[in-house]
């Protein structure tokens, strides 16, 4: 079958495209711009067109699109004219899973789903279960970063941003939490949002939930939490090299967990994975071995650069909700106790900024200094009055040292470089390219390590 993917550069879309390519289908696609994923797919021999155009046409049997692709996209218009079936990526993915009839491990929720999915996949690979993995991030141990084909169970990250996620029926499901992100896709109805989680839980054999989550804790056959839940934990130690925690089951000491990835939120992610595999009757010794070996996912507290002479770090992180940012900064302060923490934050989506507003500033105030950029729209239309300046204004009202830049190239004017500083480039948009440019500029100008601050303080 010949399949055309419109928006193939997305992390979820490219994973589905890789799956169809590995199944022997004739795959090609288009994207609005070049990305690391489009470059990777092209190297594999998959034809990629940039940008979108009605001329990007190989007479496909099927066109697959993401919700970000509008109906007036020239390729979608042509597909309708040619009477070629058009399917939403999530719908097609659900139908693919139904056809293949494999054991399914799924992870959904607002925060932590990529890392938790990666942990589940890593454990199953360690156990030699040969999983097929669909990941919303890049993990070095997967053949294609965000995808790997196996002959065992399927592990996938399930994006709750679309209400259709409730139509899936995995065998096993971890719900990390549900904080109302993407509520606009549910008619701004919390009842409708909650109902979607309830629906998928009814279609699942075993559900693991966070015991302290108001919306979904009651859905769990098994729960995990800090002090509340079937599985709880007590931190023993945390350093740059390792975290240790005592896991309790039903209030009794059960086992010791060791992790090489930093952050208390990752301890909770690992606890969810332990709850899942223990409830399924797995021997936990190799599960714990796998978790201790786990090295994380790209853009999740990823150290992109370190200069040992000046003790300057550059870290990339995908955090884009207030809770994720709070977890990130708490981790940074634990790992870098004596360094200055500077955050360069790119808000992601106007709808999220409008909904959360002051919550971003409350999370960001944990940093020593904050630079806020303009919003990365993620294909949303700009909303009047909604701007990154809102966060900047809120930070100033909290007495926090903060700066605002409208365009990413202006970052150079406002970032002050000094020794013993950790620079966190944070967001789900294209802020990672600013991180790389920052490192390049720093390396080329080490002889003059100070920069003049801008005037928009």
Swiss-Prot record:
Family matches, as Pfam families: Mur_ligase (PF01225), Mur_ligase_C (PF02875), Mur_ligase_M (PF08245)
* Classification via SUPFAM superfamilies: MurCD N-terminal domain, MurD-like peptide ligases, catalytic domain, MurD-like peptide ligases, peptide-binding domain
Q: Which EC numbers does the record give?
A: 6.3.2.8
Q: Which GO terms describe its biological process?
A: cell division; cell wall organization; peptidoglycan biosynthetic process; regulation of cell shape
> InterPro entries, per this entry?
Mur-like_cat_sf, Mur_ligase_C, Mur_ligase_C_dom_sf, Mur_ligase_cen, Mur_ligase_N, MurCDEF_pg_biosynth, UDP-N-AcMur_Ala_ligase_MurC
| GO cellular-component term (any) | cytoplasm
Which pathway does UniProt place it in? Answer: Cell wall biogenesis; peptidoglycan biosynthesis
Q: Which GO terms describe its molecular function?
A: ATP binding; UDP-N-acetylmuramate-L-alanine ligase activity
EC class name: ligase
According to UniProt, the reaction catalysed is: UDP-N-acetyl-alpha-D-muramate + L-alanine + ATP = UDP-N-acetyl-alpha-D-muramoyl-L-alanine + ADP + phosphate + H(+)
Q: List, alphabetically, the Gene3D superfamilies matched.
A: Mur ligase, C-terminal domain, Mur-like, catalytic domain, NAD(P)-binding Rossmann-like Domain
Q: Where does ATP bind?
A: 109-115
UniProt keywords (A-Z) are: ATP-binding, Cell cycle, Cell division, Cell shape, Cell wall biogenesis/degradation, Cytoplasm, Ligase, Nucleotide-binding, Peptidoglycan synthesis
Name where it's found: Cytoplasm
First-listed, main subcellular location of the protein, grouped into a coarse class: cytoplasm
**Protein function:** Cell wall formation.
In terms of PANTHER family, this protein maps to: UDP-N-ACETYLMURAMATE--L-ALANINE LIGASE, UDP-N-ACETYLMURAMATE--L-ALANINE LIGASE-RELATED
UniProt family annotation:
Belongs to the MurCDEF family.
This chain belongs to the protein called: UDP-N-acetylmuramate--L-alanine ligase
Q: What is the protein's species of origin?
A: Thermotoga maritima (strain ATCC 43589 / DSM 3109 / JCM 10099 / NBRC 100826 / MSB8)
Q: Which gene encodes it?
A: murC
